Amino acid sequence: MIRTLYWENNRLFLLDQTKLPHTIEYVECRTYTDVIDGIKTMKVRGAPAIGVSAAYGMALGELAGEDMDVIGDEIKSARPTAVNLFWAVDKVLDLVSRGKSAVDVAIEMEKDDVAINKKIGEYGNSIIDDNDTILTHCNAGALACAGYGTALGVIRAAHEANKNIDVICDETRPVLQGARLSVFEMQQENIPVRLIVDGAAGHMMQKGEVDKVIIGADRVAKDGVANKIGSLMVALAAKRYDIPFYVAAPMSTFDFENNIFDTIIEQRLPEEVLCINGKYISKKQTNVENPAFDIVESDLITGIITEEGIKKPL
């Protein structure tokens, strides 16, 4: 598996995911503001990967002698929906106040993330049957984490258990994480995969070509989850055709204090929708709504696969 990020000589290197799958290139982060830029521009994306990157951003700030509380607030503002970002910054601040170095905390967090994801894969494998076709939306794989992945980690674990599985990836407009990243990961692992446009998900379910749906999450609350835009549409189709709909996410993605509809839904630039490969597909002055996430309510969710086991939504 290609590394999403790595720490070397007191520098953080982020795989530039905006250039995948055609170019593998790492961006060097020398300052915490470099990390913020990497998060905002989606060079690094996926809730767990954002959290680990944020921890390393805090480490760079500490090495530079910055005020940790101030830079913590700056890093938290990079992307408001992913709860792991807030969790990681708060964890670093807490452990630094107890005498640990931010670098050590970040390194430990990176290692823990991979171990947690493998545990999620282990539990998730128990719900995968031989010859299953699994539909997934966006990218909740190794590229969205420090390694292995959550939703794709479950698929990876089933493949490692020699189960015969087929994967369907939604393209995931407008940034195409499914087409560019999830398909790329499956091809790297030689896991059979088909790419479909987002609007075809319901059609595939209606035809009986989907056995299970597994997605990741950027925030899990007691009454639902926030995930990449289009997840709700997939969940509604799965409910209509009685297809199990699972969410795979670490406990660090859980928000126990707020309702899911209190989530701040990030609005991204119109150009993501208006342009493909730098070319406008609609007039530049077209009004655009570009929410990055939507809400899947708990009654649409069969189970939430975590490192602690498979939890029933409340």
From Swiss-Prot:
The keyword Isomerase applies. The record marks C138 as: Transition state stabilizer. The active site is at D218. Its EC number is 5.3.1.23. Pfam families: IF-2B. It is an enzyme of class 5 (isomerase). GO terms for biological process: L-methionine salvage from methylthioadenosine. Substrate binds at R45, G46, A47, R79, Q177, N227, K228. GO terms for molecular function: S-methyl-5-thioribose-1-phosphate isomerase activity. Keywords: Amino-acid biosynthesis, Isomerase, Methionine biosynthesis. It catalyses: 5-(methylsulfanyl)-alpha-D-ribose 1-phosphate = 5-(methylsulfanyl)-D-ribulose 1-phosphate. Disulfide bonds: none annotated. It comes from the Archaea. InterPro entries: IF-2B-related, IF-M1Pi, IF_2B-like_C, Initiation_fac_2B_a/b/d, M1Pi_N, NagB/RpiA_transferase-like. Belongs to the eIF-2B alpha/beta/delta subunits family. MtnA subfamily. Catalyzes the interconversion of methylthioribose-1-phosphate (MTR-1-P) into methylthioribulose-1-phosphate (MTRu-1-P). This is Putative methylthioribose-1-phosphate isomerase. It comes from Methanosphaera stadtmanae (strain ATCC 43021 / DSM 3091 / JCM 11832 / MCB-3).
